[in-house]
Structure formats: structure tokens, C-alpha cells
């Protein structure tokens, strides 16, 4: 049985990238809802409908677990999904808690970057309210980064220009940690680093989600003996065009490059 991964677009590849590291012998289905991306700028009701359509499709593929590799979809629908399906469902949320713990010690601020919909969600506000006792957290929606990623446009000059414009009213020196609260954003780690400096920490929930997936499968005695294959679907349509598949797999190379540059520091 395979593991299903779902995202509004290609952002979930950043989570799949981490999952393959800890679970190399599983087989995966990656479902990108490219017909309806971006989710972060749409109504909650519409997005929930898209999410359930994707989950129904993945359930029909006889998966053993589902990873909602999208912060927006997790915040909107994970509880409802768990009530409706009998396989384990693992989500991803902005990694605010470790960021606050670290920045409290260092007397620095935390910047959470995400989509509009994630930042508006009550679930996110409750999470921040519960743990941000020193008013350290600032938030910024960066929908343009989702568009860059979905267009496979990783031109650093364009991205830095966009980020500089969006961050023009922020004092960048006051931040100790950037929380990448959208799964599309780890593709742009190097651009964030060029603006904030190499000392700033960048945290996403991807690693924790991958570890949680492994734990859930181990607890259920469902760890696989597969080959690490990935089958790609765009909004329910299987991708057979090798050129498109190569574009998807090239995303792993981009993530390799961002990780190498961070190891270098």
C-alpha cells in the first residue's frame, strides 16, 4: 500500500522530500491540486471542497496513510478529514512553538510567513495566543511566493525584489527566526537568508511531519518494503509526460541545493 501526499500545488514536494529521507522504502502518490491552486487566497468553503475531493480520490487508490502537505489545508480541514476516513492523516502546521522558545532565550522576534488563509484561521491565532506570552510574533502573508513556485520560477533576482518590497516596513535585524508557514516557502530559503543574514534560523514543519508519519506507520506495524517510487497526479489526472515528471523531480534538486548552502554555514 502506498502513502498519499496532498497539496494545493507543488509545495508539498518539500514535505515529501523529508519523508523520503526517513522512509526510503515506501511508495508514494503525490496529488497536486494544480487546477485550483492557490488555496491561500480562496474562500474557506471552496478550499474545503477541493480538499475533500482530493482525499476521496486518494482513498480510492487504497492508501495506508495520508499526509496533508499544505498548511492551509491542515488548518481548515484536518479534523473533518479524520472524522471521515479510517486511515491515519498527518498534517503540517507553522512551527511556531520551537521558534518562540528559541527567540525568548535570545530576545529576538519571530516572523511567521504563510498564506492569507492560514494566518486568518482561528486555529493559528489560538496557537500563537497560547504560547506567545511576550508578544514576539509578527505575521506576513506572501502569496507571491506560491505563484513563483507554481510557475517553476526560482529566479533569485525576481524573488528578492518581491521579498524586499513585501518586507519594506519590517526591521529585519530584530528577527531571530523565520517560520516558513507554507510548504512552498522552503524552496526560497536562500533568498530569505540573503535578506535576513545567515544567522537567522528558518524553521518549517516538514521535518516534524515526516518524523510523525514514520512514527504513525511504525506504531501500526505498517512500515513498507517498497522502492521509493512516486506516482504523480494533477487534480486527479495521472501525470505520464516524462518532461513534467522531470520538472517535479528537479524540485528535489533545488531543495538539495538549499540544504547544501545551509550546511556550508
From Swiss-Prot:
Catalytic residues identified in the record: 70 (proton donor/acceptor), 182 (proton donor/acceptor)
Reactions it catalyzes: L-glutamate = D-glutamate
InterPro entries: Asp/Glu/hydantoin_racemase, Asp/Glu_race, Asp/Glu_racemase_AS_1, Glu_race
Residues that coordinate or bind substrate: 7-8, 39-40, 71-72, 183-184
Known EC number: 5.1.1.3
Pfam families the record matches: Asp_Glu_race
PROSITE patterns xref list: ASP_GLU_RACEMASE_1 (PS00923)
Metabolic or biological pathway, per its Swiss-Prot or TrEMBL entry: Cell wall biogenesis; peptidoglycan biosynthesis
Keyword annotations: Cell shape, Cell wall biogenesis/degradation, Isomerase, Peptidoglycan synthesis
Signal peptide feature range: none
Gene Ontology molecular functions: amino-acid racemase activity; glutamate racemase activity
Gene Ontology biological process terms, A to Z: cell wall organization; peptidoglycan biosynthetic process; regulation of cell shape
UniProt similarity note: Belongs to the aspartate/glutamate racemases family.
Function statement: Provides the (R)-glutamate required for cell wall biosynthesis.
Entries under NCBIfam families matching the protein: glut_race
Name used for this protein in its record: Glutamate racemase 2
